[in-house]
Design a protein with these regions (language model features):
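Mid-domain, small-residue-enriched loop/turn segments at the edges of structured enzyme/sensor domains
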Residues: 58-65, 96-134
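Surface-exposed patches in mature extracellular/periplasmic domains of secreted proteins
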Residues: 42, 111-120, 146-152
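A penicillin-recognizing enzyme superfamily signal
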Residues: 1-15, 26, 78-82, 126-185
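Secondary-structure capping and boundary motifs in well-ordered enzyme cores
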Residues: 18-23, 68-72, 76, 80, ...
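Active-site SXXK
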Residues: 19-46, 79, 135-139
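Generic, well-ordered alpha-helical scaffold segments in large soluble proteins
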Residues: 33, 37, 82, 90-94, ...
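Conserved catalytic neighborhood of penicillin-recognizing serine enzymes
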Residues: 39-98, 145, 157-185
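Proteins synthesized as precursors that undergo proteolytic processing into mature forms
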Residues: 3, 7-10, 35, 42, ...
Length: 185
């Protein structure tokens, strides 16, 4: 689907095989998990610096916003719009690390790919572009997880259809609208 310089030199498919840290792309899923655990878009979270000392490792963890600006108490909806890192960490803490990791599997992410530490709220997990798109499509599809398809149909040299995909519809109303649109004169 997405390749490099030459398919003959490398059949590596960047859309389906290239796992990369997803960064802030994870935030809609973390926020969704927070809503599932009882937060609302009107919930107020403190956007303030975090300085967490780990005595066992002797290292402090200091996630920061980018830019390093903090708004203090902020509504969840505004924090998402501004992509506030420390709010994402706070929501993960409020909803629970394991609960959030389990919730992310509803979007098609493999549990084995989700680190069980707070950095997951900042996008430290690695996923392929296809996995991220599939996850985002759950939001677009009203909560339905569907498997993406790449080929809609196969035609012969005369334009005759040899094969057509039969995708699962995310909502039955959409399917009915599609059928009524094609049956009208």
């Amino acid at each position: 689907v997405v390749g490099g310089y030459s398919f003959y030199q490398s059949q590596f498919n960047r859309a389906t095989q290239a796992k990369r840290q997803v960064g802030s792309n994870i935030k809609p899923f973390v926020y969704s998990a927070a809503i599932n655990s009882g937060y609302t878009l009107a919930s107020i979270i403190n956007d303030a610096p975090i300085n967490q000392w780990n005595a066992a490792t002797g290292v402090a963890w200091r996630p920061q916003n980018s830019p390093a600006e903090y708004d203090g108490p902020i509504r969840m909806r505004k924090a998402l719009g501004k992509s506030k890192n420390v709010v994402s960490v706070g929501l993960l803490r409020g909803g629970g690390l394991r609960e959030t990791a389990n919730y992310l599997t509803r979007f098609g992410f493999n549990k084995e790919d989700i680190p069980l530490d707070e950095t997951v709220s900042l996008g430290s997990s690695s996923h392929t572009p296809l996995e991220v798109v599939r996850g985002m499509s759950v939001i677009a599809n009203g909560g339905y997880l569907v498997n993406p398809h790449f080929i809609s149909e196969v035609l012969d040299e005369n334009g005759e259809q040899l094969w057509q995909t039969n995708p699962v519809w995310a909502c039955h109303r959409c399917e009915e609208e599609d059928e009524s649109a094609t049956s009208q004169p």
